[in-house]
């Protein structure tokens, strides 16, 4: 057992923590020992002195303690972090297809009891994002352990790239930066920022330095397959295409034509590159999706009979959910107005704050206003390498629906 400074929490926080939720807010702390520094591991106790868990302490954050262990006998040394790495990796090896090991989320924060940490594997490159100060302090022990775990399982690692260029780090009192992680386990001569991966039989070039988030969105892996199954012979419009993943899967599935839109020039160029290297016919175009859909509606243009809506999160806060609701409703309404009877709509939200019930409400309102009836074909969530903890609703964020206009 490790001797740690103590934090005593309220009864309400104790019940939440014992129920499996790892976050303790500053307002829920009754007492904290003197001398605790930001990023320290603390022992969390109830007002009666009962052990609740061990967690990262950060007074600069609203989430003041992030519990990551409920075993009072844990010692937080290199061996502990390597065990955590092994547990996360072995879960993926059990639930994912073998062909997905080279494009897989290895660590999904709280769902892996590693608060604020994301690790994606793109071939032999790891892309890492650290959003909690405690994990930043223990990053070296964990990442070195992770590299060893992967190599022990014959999974190569040539370099690790840190994508810590996100503003949310400042809320934890950390600086933004990006660059290669250096370790005696890694050869600087092997460093690279672009790597090719294969997902669902399609080759992509991933830019871990400049791509969105960690470089590529892995959470829609199986949703793309579902979308492709009904695309044969269809004229498809893929909105917010990013690197073209939905467009390429549907094109591979036999679509008659595929147009992929994104407001980002870099995204459009990467989509065109990915289409070319796979020998797939996809027209990649730079456009504002809202304006494009509005213009099609004005022209009464019904040439597309399958539309994919995979927008970025319109809200990252509960405070802006109402504005996000309007944004989601607007694009879904426009898509429904454009689609002919018998056409298909794939629509998604990647915001936790836009919950499943609220998203369904939005879809129903959009359909009512567009004067259409929807037939639900399928509902899906994020891929299993992004696991959902039933006690931590924040780990559930991705909703994916397939509808037909009837």
Where are these regions (language model features)?
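Non-catalytic accessory regions of SAM-dependent methyltransferases
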Residues: 1-123
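Mobile active-site "lid"/loop adjacent to the S-adenosyl-L-methionine
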Residues: 304-334
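S-adenosyl-L-methionine
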Residues: 266-308
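Conserved SAM-binding motif I beta-strand of class I
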Residues: 257-262
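Conserved class I S-adenosyl-L-methionine
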Residues: 233-242
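Conserved SAM-binding loop of SAM-dependent methyltransferases across substrates and taxa
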Residues: 243-256
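Non-catalytic substrate-recognition/targeting regions of SAM-dependent transferases
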Residues: 107-120, 140-216
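C-terminal catalytic and target-recognition region of SAM-dependent MTase-like enzymes
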Residues: 303, 330, 344-406
């Amino acid at each position: 057992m490790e001797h740690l400074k103590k934090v005593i929490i309220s009864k309400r926080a104790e019940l939440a923590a014992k129920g499996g939720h790892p976050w303790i807010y500053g307002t829920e702390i009754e007492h904290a020992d003197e001398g605790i520094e930001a990023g320290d591991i603390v022992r969390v106790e109830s007002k009666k002195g009962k052990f609740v868990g061990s967690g990262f302490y950060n007074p600069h954050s609203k989430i003041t303690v992030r519990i990551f262990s409920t075993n009072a006998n844990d010692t937080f040394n290199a061996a502990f972090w390597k065990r955590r790495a092994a547990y996360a990796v072995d879960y993926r090896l059990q639930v994912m297809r073998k062909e997905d090991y080279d494009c897989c989320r290895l660590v999904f924060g709280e769902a892996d009891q590693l608060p604020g940490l994301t690790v994606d594997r793109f071939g032999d490159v790891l892309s890492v994002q650290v959003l909690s100060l405690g994990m930043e302090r223990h990053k070296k022990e964990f990442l070195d352990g992770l590299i060893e775990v992967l190599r022990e399982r014959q999974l190569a690692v040539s370099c690790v790239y840190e994508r810590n260029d996100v503003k949310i780090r400042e809320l934890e009192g950390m600086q933004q930066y990006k660059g290669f992680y250096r370790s005696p386990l890694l050869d600087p001569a092997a460093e690279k920022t672009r790597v090719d991966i294969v997902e669902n039989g399609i080759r992509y070039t991933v830019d871990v330095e400049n791509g969105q988030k960690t470089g590529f969105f892995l959470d829609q892996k199986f949703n793309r397959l579902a979308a492709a199954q009904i695309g044969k012979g269809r004229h498809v419009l893929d909105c917010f295409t990013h690197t073209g993943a939905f467009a390429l899967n549907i094109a591979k599935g036999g679509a008659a034509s595929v147009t992929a839109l994104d407001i980002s020039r870099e995204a459009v160029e990467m989509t065109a590159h990915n289409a070319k290297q796979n020998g797939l016919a996809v027209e990649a175009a730079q456009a504002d999706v809202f304006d494009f859909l509005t213009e099609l509606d004005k022209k009464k243009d019904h040439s597309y009979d399958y539309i994919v809506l995979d927008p970025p999160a319109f809200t990252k806060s509960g405070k802006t959910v109402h504005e996000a609701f309007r944004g989601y409703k607007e694009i879904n309404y426009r898509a429904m107005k454009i689609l002919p009877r018998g056409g298909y709509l794939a629509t998604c939200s990647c915001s936790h704050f836009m919950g499943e019930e609220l998203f369904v409400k939005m879809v129903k309102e959009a359909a009512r206003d567009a004067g259409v009836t929807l037939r639900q074909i399928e509902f899906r969530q994020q891929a299993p390498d992004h696991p959902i903890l039933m006690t931590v609703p924040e780990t559930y964020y991705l909703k994916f629906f397939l509808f037909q206009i009837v």
